[in-house]
């Protein structure tokens, strides 16, 4: 019994030690959740995207900001968090519930919430307590404007099935970009300036 307790204690220490302290957003669990959320979004497909071509719109995904080198190290975590929070907010609405299979939608919202909780666990550790006011950060404002454009589009289209299908495809792009950012952070140990 003492051996088992020692082993468990060692595992806890390793997970909170230098190797495990790269920040919760770099965890393997977060990457698995991200892949599962993309898989769920793919399964939510109800219409052929080709039948909705007339409703296409360029929402202006700040892809080069998320996937490129435009983000500073201290901006990457807040941008990732904001992308996930806005995605959750989009799918956790009454209009969304009416548009999608509720089982898949609930699983997606649960997965996004899990990612947010994982990120929130070390929010202060990664950003510093003094940096927690992020509303004025330019990249965050860019992400918020991007999602506001999606909300405006859905409202303009009367939350039609085709509008939701276009948004579903767009959200796959957005979450793929955020996953790319997570991978970059994982490869560099949180330092975006590393080669």
From Swiss-Prot:
Keywords, alphabetical: Antiviral defense, Cytokine, Disulfide bond, Hormone, Pregnancy, Secreted, Signal
MF-aspect GO terms: cytokine activity; cytokine receptor binding; hormone activity
PROSITE patterns (UniProt xref): INTERFERON_A_B_D
Pfam families cross-referenced by the UniProt entry: Interferon
Bridged cysteine pairs (disulfide): 24-122, 52-162
Signal peptide: 1-23
Annotated Gene Ontology cellular component terms: extracellular space
Record-linked InterPro entries: 4_helix_cytokine-like_core, Interferon_alpha/beta/delta
Misc. remarks from the entry: IFN-tau genes are intronless. They evolved from IFN-omega genes in the ruminantia suborder and have continued to duplicate independently in different lineages of the ruminantia. They code for proteins very similar in sequence but with different biological potency and pattern of expression.
Purpose: Paracrine hormone primarily responsible for maternal recognition of pregnancy. Interacts with endometrial receptors, probably type I interferon receptors, and blocks estrogen receptor expression, preventing the estrogen-induced increase in oxytocin receptor expression in the endometrium. This results in the suppression of the pulsatile endometrial release of the luteolytic hormone prostaglandin F2-alpha, hindering the regression of the corpus luteum (luteolysis) and therefore a return to ovarian cyclicity.
The protein's name: Interferon tau-8
Record lineage: Eukaryota, Metazoa, Chordata, Craniata, Vertebrata
């Amino acid at each position: 019994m003492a051996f088992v307790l020692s082993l468990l204690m060692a595992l806890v220490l390793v997970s909170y030690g230098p190797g495990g302290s790269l920040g919760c957003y770099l965890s393997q669990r977060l990457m698995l959740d991200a892949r599962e959320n993309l898989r769920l979004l793919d399964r939510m497909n109800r219409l052929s995207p080709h039948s909705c071509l007339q409703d296409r719109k360029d929402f202006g995904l700040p892809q080069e900001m998320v996937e490129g080198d435009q983000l500073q190290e201290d901006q990457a975590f807040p941008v990732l968090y904001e992308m996930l929070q806005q995605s959750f907010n989009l799918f956790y609405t009454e209009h969304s519930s009416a548009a999608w299979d509720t089982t898949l939608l609930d699983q997606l919202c649960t997965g996004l919430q899990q990612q947010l909780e994982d990120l929130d666990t070390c929010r202060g550790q990664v950003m510093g307590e003094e940096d927690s006011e992020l509303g004025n950060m330019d990249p965050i404002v860019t992400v918020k404007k991007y999602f506001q454009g999606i909300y405006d589009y859905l409202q303009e289209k009367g939350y039609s099935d085709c509008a939701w299908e276009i948004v579903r495809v767009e959200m796959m792009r957005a979450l793929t970009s955020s996953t790319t950012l997570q991978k970059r952070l994982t490869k560099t140990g949180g330092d975006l300036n590393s080669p």
